[in-house]
Amino acid sequence: MTERLVIIGGCAAGMSAASKARRTDPDLDILVYEKTGFVAYGACGMPYYVSGLVQDHNTLVVRTPEQFARQEIKVHLHHEVTGIDAARCRVRVSDLESGETREEACDKLVIATGGRSAIPAGAPGFSPGELQGVFTLRALEDGIAIREFIQREKPRRAVIVGAGYIGLEMAESFRVLGLETTVIGRPPQMLKRFDPEMAQFMQGALEDEGVRLSLGDEAKALEGDSQGRVRQVVSSSGAFEADLVLLALSVLPNVALAEAAGVALGETGAIATDAGMRTNLPNVFAAGDCAEAYHRVIGRGAYIPLGTTANKQGRVMGTNAGGGQATFKGIVGTTITKAFDTYAALTGLAEKEARALGYEVKSTTIKARSRAHYYPGSAPMHVRLVVQEGSGRLLGGQIIGDEGAGLRINVLAGALHSDMTVEQLSQLDLAYMPPMSPVWDPLLVAANVALKG
């Protein structure tokens, strides 16, 4: 008898799981329920669609429901799963267009419900739909709505509430479009995973491009005019005029559905899984922004929601849901973002994070050049290494600079994945040519300075 796999959520983890499950078991009956109008799209490309760098939102879509149908993967758009009966392995599904509700049986269940934007409870003006011109950016439909609003209403002043990756990238998008842009962040720095000494370089890059930063500040209320259009953001430091507000606060795991069904959560509040992406319930899997990921540096689950992790976890989950055998080897927390010509990359632990976890550490920060000093385009690059005292074990790294930051952070990610010491890092045989690096790569310079320290 043919088994049925039901997948809740059609973005990175869900559709990676669907595709891999199909390749693992050609006979599996696969149903995907997605409450929005799109599946399998590059969510990280949305800021560039808003700015106009990417002209057509359809180019962000990797595969359409029709393409999945050719693999015999049935995708149901605008369908929301509102309940899970794990004991009977059934889900309650609501058709958001017709209003009809039905039950669907399954043999195995994948939960890929993703993350949700953190919205301050009870704060005036923050509730969805309360004021025109207030947006979040999680789904592709959000990006489309923001771009259409800008084209239709031609706002002059944008305020971004939140100073993380989305806030930073959207600040660039709004400035590219000519909007006066303010970023309000509750922490005293942008990019809170970074050490303050490194975050300041990115903050300077934004201010150089005309972005106003109000850090160590908290948005308290959004106020509108008589027609219900947002007009200002009231914060603990004052008021900021706004025609457009983007709420880019923390991403939280979307786990209410899973938790109600008895799925266990980890210490982070996201779904806990084993290395095969199995939950505590039989035949129920979870992956992506709703789930924890094993962090190789700290040796336990962490919540660092990223598309790269979601795709890898989804692939493992799909293999196992399809009857195969696969394990997720873990993350080291590698991220990168960009604003204008400055890139900020991080892997592993920042010094402040390592100390909070009880590690005794020393940090080394150096300034080098991204290319040979005489080669056109050579630019400053700041590298920070975090090393465990005594053992010399590499715990993390941060790089601020030009596009070369991305290439180098991947070297550090590999070093962390392999549990290398800073001495071993210093001995790596890295490529050299003047257009790409100095003869002493900034990573090697930083490692050698750390060894002296």
Regions found by a protein language model. Name each.
Residues 8-12, 22-27, 35-36, 340-347, ...:
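Flexible, glycine-rich terminal cap/loop adjacent to redox cofactors
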Residues 113-177, 212, 273-275:
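Glycine-rich dinucleotide-binding loop and its adjacent helix/turn
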Residues 60-61, 157-159, 165-223, 305-310, ...:
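Rossmann-like dinucleotide-binding cores of NAD(P)H-dependent redox enzymes
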